[in-house]
Amino acid sequence: MKKILILPGDGIGQEVTNECLKVISYFQKDCEIEYTEDLFGGASIDVHGEPLTKEVLKKAMEADAVLLGAVGGPKWEQLEHNLKPEKGLLTLRKELEAFANLRPGKVFPALIDASSLKKSIVKGTDIFVVRELTGGIYFGEPRYIKEVDGKKVGANNLIYSEDEIARVARVAFEIARKRRNKVTSLDKANVLEVMQLWRDVVSEIHSNEFKDVELDHLYIDNAAMQVIKRPSTFDVILAGNLFGDIISDEVAELTGSLGMLPSASIGNKYGIYEPVHGSAPDIAGQNI
């Protein structure tokens, strides 16, 4: 028996997961699948006062997979940082150790006219973004907004350990072996020490374990330009949490719509599966 925890979340999330349930129900004819549904994100805040309760986290850790709709919306934007719907998602990823986010961005011939770029540029584009998901600046401590000498100061810390970098790099290289055998790692090693560590560790993993895979490195600002200029030349893109968050949305736009793409966040044991898009409150409830 396989167990799936369904967390519709907010906005269009309920409609999205309802459609997924039709697929799950179809496979129940031949597979033993049990699913439960619970509150998450803003929907959980409205009832329980927090985006992710201990009870829901326990259910997630007992499930074989988590199916997520979407979280967030204008209704909860003014809440304190640790009470926002997105905080529940960050905590869920961290607690399940879902350290690698996988996002494909493929331009299909039938949908090429939906792309914002010319056909001649996006034709043949098939990019797979591997984003480190449970480390980096989104989780680094200390983090604060405080007053110093009468002025507000905000700070976040961009921190990565060797192990955090190595494990997500291995995921990227393994995926590349099953595709076109190339990894492009993104960093800012020219100005950030932590990004120099990123580059060093990725290079070491490549040299010791994946010499058969082609590896190149790009600074994130140059990469953002090259993905627009020559998208079809990329295969697997490896990036840290912040850079991966940004570049994966850019890659998604090449395909024509962020709303049509899937996302998987995986670790050694757990997996979280969701659409790439947000809660889309402007069209929620319209069943489209």
Segments predicted by a language model, with ranges:
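Glycine-rich phosphate/nucleotide-binding loop
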Residues: G42-I45, V227-I288
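Short acidic loop-to-helix transition motifs that present clustered carboxylates
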Residues: G41, A110, L218-M225
